[in-house]
Swiss-Prot record:
Its main location: membrane. The chain crosses the membrane at residues 37-57, 85-105, 118-138, 171-191. PANTHER family: CASP-LIKE PROTEIN 2C1-RELATED (PTHR33573:SF30), CASP-LIKE PROTEIN 4A4 (PTHR33573). It comes from Selaginella moellendorffii (Spikemoss). Homodimer and heterodimers. One of its GO terms (cellular component) is plasma membrane. Signal peptide: none annotated. This is CASP-like protein 2U1. Pfam families: CASP_dom. Keywords: Cell membrane, Glycoprotein, Membrane, Transmembrane, Transmembrane helix.
Length: 204
């Protein structure tokens, strides 16, 4: 015979110390649903920010006439850093979308889709690798944007944002969104690490 407390049965003879908390099945279910919901939202945001970076970079072109007969054009591929960022953002965008779909299915079914230790490790490693690669690429692009705006006296590189203000403004927005995408990927990596830790403890 026992006393029913929520979904948990506590024997009458058992002692529960003051301040102790009994975790019920409903609480565990709610925690899982919340975590899966957060995982989906973070991954879909990572997808959206990476997509915004791609669109901004591809469409960031400005042509300026600096003198009669002299026309200059600024494009994202004038330097290597934005090109690398575009390639990496495209990879991250596709990966984030696939993971968002998997996360949404897990949320709907209330169980992990592709529930496998090898895949859990693969997700964890890919989250980590892509986060650091995206961070490095965003930092390199930020440096290129800074030099374009301020110049570099030591190597006699002149600032170019004077005649290309719109281009530089869009470039700055791209860098900002890139770092927001990095934050979203970092949170996703933390969640996948938590899932891997739970699996190592015998939880699904």
């Amino acid at each position: 015979m026992g006393v029913l407390g929520g979904d948990a049965h506590v024997p009458i003879g058992s002692q529960v110390s003051p301040g102790s908390v009994v975790v019920t099945n409903n609480e565990s279910f709610g925690h899982r649903k919340l975590l899966k919901g957060v995982d989906f939202l973070v991954r879909i945001k990572a997808f959206a920010f990476c997509l915004a970076v791609i669109v901004l970079l591809k469409n960031n072109v400005q042509t300026t006439v600096i003198a009669p007969g002299i026309v200059l054009q600024a494009k994202y591929n004038n330097t290597k850093a934005p090109v690398s960022l575009l390639v990496l953002a495209s990879i991250c965008c596709g990966y984030a979308f696939l993971q968002a779909v998997v996360s949404l299915l897990s949320f709907i079914r209330d169980k992990r889709v592709l529930n496998n230790t090898v895949l859990a490790w693969l997700t964890f490693l890919l989250d980590q690798v892509l986060t650091y690669l995206l961070l490095g690429s965003a930092a390199a692009t930020a440096e290129a944007a800074y030099i374009a705006k301020r110049g570099e006296d030591k190597v006699q590189w002149k600032a170019v944002c004077g005649p290309f203000k719109r281009f530089c403004d869009h470039f700055a927005a791209t860098v900002f969104l890139s770092f927001i995408a990095v934050i979203a990927f970092a949170v996703s990596a933390a969640i996948s690490a938590y899932y891997l830790f739970r699996r190592s403890k015998g939880f699904k």
